[in-house]
Regions:
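Sec-exported extracytoplasmic/periplasmic mature domains
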Residues: 28-32, 52-55, 59-62, 98-109, ...
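Extracytoplasmic/secreted proteins, especially bacterial periplasmic and envelope-associated proteins
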Residues: 15-18, 22-25, 42, 46-49, ...
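Amphipathic alpha-helical coiled-coil/heptad-repeat segments
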Residues: 3-81, 94, 99, 113-117, ...
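Surface-exposed patches in mature extracellular/periplasmic domains of secreted proteins
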Residues: 66, 100-119, 190-199, 221-225, ...
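Active-site rim elements
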Residues: 7-10, 84-86, 240-248
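Zinc-dependent metallopeptidase catalytic helix centered on the HExxH motif
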Residues: 137-220, 225
């Protein structure tokens, strides 16, 4: 469990920080000219004990049998790249993502555990940089369970902190994208979106791109296949489609569709895509079609009606 590992490391670091602060206090006391030789000896002995305690913590703090602060290849954190990724997760990537999701989408997780894995998945550099996986009910109703965030270290190396990676696929953006999936998995009837009869993967991926913005990706797609090519991707969305393609251009089209829906909701007096998310969260059995209908005040009867409008008018929206 990645979160538990981070908590273990955080507790050990807090203890070492306390010892270092005490050593600093002792050094200041030792500089006082009124100290006798025996006083200075006592201060030095206490400092030595604190140093030994720091060394003990650094060599004995473990998680699942691995030394957390062992900087050798034998430790899960011995790899400096893995250590940097864990540092990025602990010092901003996760917190920033959760904060953005709460602010802009109005949803948060339900407190269920989520594993973070650095070594269980890889498809090589340039493939899937990270993914969230979970068990979706076969009835296509309800939340996902056993949710895991799996990071492909081949795409996170070198980590290039603090943002990580390079434009437009910065590591912190990738984590934000995946955390949208993780939170949606545990905050709504996510299983209904995986039903092959409706296939609403476009919304899952478009919303995940929308949280951090994907204009750079969209511009790259336009340069490659043109606005018409992007819109052709949109014709596969929903029940009329042939399933999610998964290419960068598919993500561009999905992102644009969510942007279009966001604007349509605002034009109807709502606050945007947040209204869809909040509706799904507050109505645990609701489907995306019902949420879109409610958020737009009935402008769209269902998700397919929205898709039809987007296919017809999305090109002008992109160009405009």
């Amino acid at each position: 469990d990645g979160i538990s590992m981070l908590q273990t490391a955080d507790g050990a670091l807090a203890s070492m920080t306390s010892s270092l602060q005490r050593i600093r206090e002792l050094s200041i006391q030792a500089a006082n000219s009124t100290n006798s030789a025996s006083d200075k000896k006592a201060l030095q002995e206490e400092a030595n004990q604190l140093i030994q305690e720091i060394e003990r913590i650094s060599t004995t703090t473990t998680f699942n049998g691995d030394r957390i602060f062992d900087f050798t290849g034998s430790s899960v954190l011995g790899d400096p790249d893995k250590l940097a990724v864990v540092y990025g997760l602990q010092n901003g990537w996760l917190e920033q993502a959760e904060s953005q999701i709460q602010e802009y989408f109005g949803i948060s997780g339900d407190g269920a555990d989520m594993s973070i894995e650095l070594t269980t998945f890889t498809d090589g550099a340039g493939g899937t940089a990270a993914r969230v996986v979970g068990s979706v009910p076969g009835s296509y109703t309800g939340k996902a369970t056993d949710v895991k965030l799996q990071i492909d270290m081949s795409d996170f190396t070198p980590p290039n902190l603090p943002n990580g990676g390079s434009a437009p696929f910065y590591n912190d953006r990738i984590i934000s994208h995946e955390m949208v999936h993780a939170v949606m998995y545990r905050s709504m009837n996510i299983a209904s979106m995986f039903d092959p009869a409706v296939d609403q993967t476009w919304f899952l991926e478009g919303a995940a791109e929308f949280i951090h913005g994907a204009d750079e990706r969209l511009q790259s797609s336009i340069s490659s296949i043109g606005i018409g090519g992007v819109m052709t991707k949109a014709t596969t969305f929903g029940s009329a489609g042939a399933g999610w393609g998964g290419t960068s251009d598919d993500y561009s089209a999905a992102y644009t569709a969510v942007r279009y829906l966001h604007q349509a909701i605002k034009d109807n007096g709502g606050s945007g895509i947040k209204d869809v998310m909040v509706y799904l969260n507050q109505n645990q059995s609701a489907t995306l079609s019902q949420a879109i209908n409610a958020a737009t005040g009935g402008v769209y009867a269902d998700a397919d009606a929205f898709n039809a409008d987007f296919v017809a008018n999305g090109a002008a929206f992109i160009a405009g």
